[in-house]
């Protein structure tokens, strides 16, 4: 974890030795202000959360690209966001995307749940025609090709994220 260590010491020579390390976020020489340490910890947490969010979203989009989803479609963006929201919620079993997670995505993008659902279905239809049969069979472990439902796509990608 680069830039995630805060050093507090009364020994100036020790602080000088570690100051340029990639792992040091900030150094404090005693006496110090606790408010500054608290602010530094909050900044580290925010930066790490942002990096984790960016990494997860990148992995989701990578999986969608494998399936030949077209990112010019709004539905692809909504599907990606829906998968991210489920991942973030730590829900292991989602019964109804339309009732549980589409409203979250709809609120974020200021759209109706029906618009989110329709755009996701449109993106899936386009993906189904753009993606090779072989890729669909391998990815979804199908013996024959059928158009996947949104929930199937969500679960498969979540399983890949959880490893």
Which positions does each model-derived feature cover?
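Hydrophobic aliphatic residue packing
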Residues: 5-6, 41, 107, 116
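Short gly/pro/ser/thr-enriched loop/turn and capping motifs at secondary-structure boundaries
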Residues: 14-15, 36
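A short, hydrophobic beta-strand element within the central beta-sheet of small alpha/beta folds
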Residues: 2-13, 28
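Receiver (REC) domain switch/output surface
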Residues: 21-23, 36-49
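Receiver (REC) domain switch/active-site region of two-component response regulators
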Residues: 32-33
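Nucleotide/phosphate-binding catalytic cleft detector across ATP-hydrolyzing
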Residues: 18
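Short loop/turn motifs at secondary-structure junctions
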Residues: 1-2, 23
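C-terminal output/effector regions of signal-responsive regulators
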Residues: 52-163
